[in-house]
Design a protein with these regions (language model features):
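Short, solvent-exposed amphipathic alpha-helices that sit
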Residues: 75-82, 106-126, 143, 167-171, ...
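Flexible loop/hinge segments that line or gate small-molecule binding clefts
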Residues: 31, 36-74, 189-198, 202
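Hydrophobic alpha-helical
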Residues: 13-18, 22-43, 115, 133-194
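Short beta-strand elements in bilobed, periplasmic/extracellular small-molecule ligand-binding domains
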Residues: 1-2, 96-101, 116-134
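Hydrophobic alpha-helical segments within soluble ligand-binding/sensing domains
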Residues: 9, 66-94, 140-141, 165, ...
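Hinge/cleft segment of the Venus flytrap/periplasmic-binding protein
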Residues: 99-102, 107, 119, 188, ...
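Short beta-strand segments enriched in small/hydrophobic residues
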Residues: 23, 28, 65-67, 95-104
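Early extracytoplasmic/lumenal segment of secretory-pathway proteins
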Residues: 1-19
Length: 247
């Protein structure tokens, strides 16, 4: 686990290249920053399979054997629908929403665009009042707290990633806004599932099932190694919406 560190990712991949492994599976740390690392592996003759995040499209076309991802626009639309349901049910016709983002990756930009498109079509008065980076948990908490303090009438926060989602929830709790500010998030973890079960702050999460993704990545990696891949590089994996953990 590179833990968001490009240098760690580079070291890990170089170690695998030196071992002459059959394939490398990774979720890229940075769309642009990880490009050289992926290129080195590819030029060493080792196929690279990305999941969830990858390098830029030009790099995918040239150096990546497969990229498995849930359609990010559809991902955002599902979350936007859930947010619209919440605002309509609570008779909030002009909600103010802040975004904590991971927009170093194009997939996160598309998640937000899908979210905004559906939300604003169903709740025309909705406003995105802020959009700040906070992919890593600690930063997401700090960003979330500052957004809450600077926007006293904030109604909700959208988290574009797991770290952003959990950070938003913790920021709401830290600022004693539970029950006043809702969070709509992305990417399920055990702690996020617990917050969804509690339902006081976190109202909905969209996720690409880890099990489904793992199975799809494993199957595609075997196809690549055995030279049975059909040439399709970007492979869509199913997306799920959760409004409570038993969904």
């Amino acid at each position: 686990n590179a833990q968001g560190d490009i240098s760690k990712e580079s070291t890990f991949v170089d170690t695998l290249v030196a071992r002459n492994v059959d394939a490398i599976i990774l979720s890229a740390v940075s769309e642009n920053g990880s490009s050289r690392t992926v290129r080195r592996a590819s030029e060493a003759g080792i196929p690279v399979i990305c999941y969830n995040t990858c390098i830029n499209q030009k790099g995918v076309d040239k150096y990546v054997s497969a990229y498995l991802v849930g359609d990010p626009l559809e991902f955002g639309k599902k979350l936007g629908n859930a947010a619209a349901d919440y605002f309509i049910a609570n008779k909030i016709d002009q909600p103010k929403i802040a975004v904590i983002n991971c927009e170093a990756f194009e997939v996160c930009v598309q998640r937000r665009k899908g979210f905004e498109e559906v939300l604003k079509s169903r709740v025309p008065g909705a406003q995105i009042v802020a959009n700040q980076e906070g992919t890593v948990l600690d930063k997401a908490i700090s960003v979330g707290e500052k957004l809450i303090i600077s926007t006293p009438d904030l109604n909700a926060i959208m988290g574009e990633s797991g770290g952003a989602t959990l950070g938003a929830v913790k920021a709401v709790r830290n600022q004693n806004q539970a029950g006043k500010i809702a969070v709509f998030g992305s990417d399920m973890t055990t702690e996020i599932a617990q917050e969804l079960e509690n339902n006081q702050v976190l109202k909905a999460v969209v996720d690409i099932s880890g099990k489904k993704m793992g199975n799809a990545v494993f199957a595609q990696t075997l196809k690549v190694i055995n030279k049975q891949a059909d040439g399709e590089k970007v492979i869509q994996v199913p997306i799920d919406l959760y409004t409570k953990t038993e969904d």
